[in-house]
Structure formats: C-alpha cells, structure tokens
C-alpha cells in the first residue's frame, strides 16, 4: 500500500525541534521524502500500524499535526506528478 505521511511539528521550543528531527528521521527510515514534511511510503499493513504507533509516540498532539493518507491501489492511478522530482523505484533492482 502507498501511504502519504505529512506533519507540521512546532519548533518554537528545543523539545519541538527535537521532535521534528525524530519524526523526520523515522519517516526517512521507511519512506521517501517528496517535500520537506511529506513522505511517500510503500509498506504493508503491519508496517503501517507500527509507523503510526511510533509517530504518535513522538508528536505532541497539543502542538503538532500529523496526517496519514492511505492511497487506493494502484496508486499510479491516483497520483499525478509534475515538475523536477526523481522518485526511487522501490520495486526495481537496487544498484549499489
């Protein structure tokens, strides 16, 4: 499944800046950054539930905003892409 993760973490305080770094690092570990606070993640249901749990443990619900969107498959029918962005093909072979 394709998940879109968006967040807006308050950075008014040192704790907020730490939360922002932790949320971004967590998203980077499982998905691909497409904008500053937007990630695309191709994951299964178990990974989705774990990601949601971990993200909710990081944010401050009084200060921050987190949105998780599950796109209907096939995602290619629901996502239109314009401009200069080079997506990584997670389904294809990995060259190191």
Curated annotation (Swiss-Prot):
GO terms for biological process: defense response to virus; maintenance of CRISPR repeat elements. SUPFAM superfamilies: TTP0101/SSO1404-like. Its cofactor is Mg(2+). Homodimer, forms a heterotetramer with a Cas1 homodimer. InterPro entries: CRISPR_associated_Cas2, Virulence_VapD/CRISPR_Cas2. One of its GO terms (molecular function) is metal ion binding. Mg(2+) binds at residue 8. This is CRISPR-associated endoribonuclease Cas2 3. It comes from the Bacteria. CRISPR (clustered regularly interspaced short palindromic repeat), is an adaptive immune system that provides protection against mobile genetic elements (viruses, transposable elements and conjugative plasmids). CRISPR clusters contain sequences complementary to antecedent mobile elements and target invading nucleic acids. CRISPR clusters are transcribed and processed into CRISPR RNA (crRNA). Involved in the integration of spacer DNA into the CRISPR cassette. Functions as a ssRNA-specific endoribonuclease. Belongs to the CRISPR-associated endoribonuclease Cas2 protein family. It comes from Nitrosomonas europaea (strain ATCC 19718 / CIP 103999 / KCTC 2705 / NBRC 14298). Keywords: Antiviral defense, Endonuclease, Hydrolase, Magnesium, Metal-binding, Nuclease. Its EC number is 3.1.-.-.
